[in-house]
């Protein structure tokens, strides 16, 4: 039986390699992306992330039973760097846009598709090690880290109350020369996930993280 997946933000860079790997592995993919991807087994659902809203996202989604839903969209995030200095301000409007794209949109998606999610559906987020907060110099990525931290807790919240296997991945870093290897490795981690892994986060090599 063909597996179906719904991917967000996997239309370029490492994400595109991940999309191609899943497609080559037999997945039928609905790809929500600002990039148009012409590849076998991939249907692109084009989105303008910045102008998107709850209504447009719901209209875009195809309501069907997916084996995998994965959130890899990344608009960055602020404030950060010298946005904290007296001479600079960070736009609250931009701040809100980042929160919408990265945190609120996945929440809306899961709620909208709730009736199609089963105990075996895998729902994942791409995170970052910045959320741990041990390195005090990383305040320069404060907005980005806060978005990823929010997603960790959203993932855990759903794992407590919703059907499905909810998880997250810490990619550490994606060197261009390792795109293919990392795509294969993360795909392998996802394939092995079971109900006992619900609510957990893993490093990209499969080691338990948080």
Region spans (language model):
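Catalytic loop of short-chain dehydrogenase/reductase
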Residues: 75-79, 84-99, 107-108, 114, ...
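C-terminal helical subdomain
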Residues: 164-172, 176-210
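Conserved glycine-rich Rossmann-like NAD(P)H-binding loop of the short-chain dehydrogenase/reductase
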Residues: 26-38
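Rossmann-fold cofactor-recognition segment
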Residues: 39-53
